[in-house]
């Protein structure tokens, strides 16, 4: 974690990464902008994994006074530059549309983001760089959703529209998130993206059969 301080007037156009500049994290009532480099990093990873057309930061850094004006404590992760509320956009059949929060939260889980993830509502998601994992639903009094966004969102009636290929280590191992994604594909709940086809053999329709799913599960638990 490295929190850097910028001036909106002087540094607003400074590029932080391929897809983000300083002023996107700005607070309305101050020239000061604080940004955690780890936050920028995970936003870039999310952008790539979801193949976004853009990510809109609806709330980045907040001064303590601005945070309180929103009914918050004035001491949260936004006030230290460690949080961002976002909408993620992509193209579907030539039309730009927002990802549902289910897609974003599940993507962050698959990316291994064991910090703060909050489903605000609908398409809006909160991300922060706290040192401990806390995944929560703001619509349910900020209560923890547990350790699996896929299960939680399914119970809420939200199906992830496109799974994300998880990281595979140098030994070709995958984790339980990858295994679940492949199993979902094998029973027709989701389809694989081009990036995912390297995970297992797929047929011409992009489906994974039960043999592939079983192999991935065995890899996930270290039996293969």
Language-model segments: residues:
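Catalytic cores and adjacent binding grooves of peptidoglycan-active enzymes
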Residues: 75, 79-80, 84, 88-162
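Extracytoplasmic cell-surface/polysaccharide-interacting catalytic and binding patches
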Residues: 1-51, 131, 142-149, 154-158
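Second-shell loop/turn segments in exported
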Residues: 26-36, 89-95, 169, 203
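Structured segments of extracytoplasmic/periplasmic soluble domains
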Residues: 45-53, 107-114, 185, 219
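Short, glycine/charged-enriched secondary-structure capping and boundary segments
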Residues: 70-73, 197
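Stable alpha-helical elements in mature extracytoplasmic
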Residues: 35-42, 100-104, 178, 212-213
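Extended, low-complexity, intrinsically disordered C-terminal regulatory tails
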Residues: 38-71
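Cellulosome-associated attachment modules in secreted, modular CAZymes
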Residues: 161-224
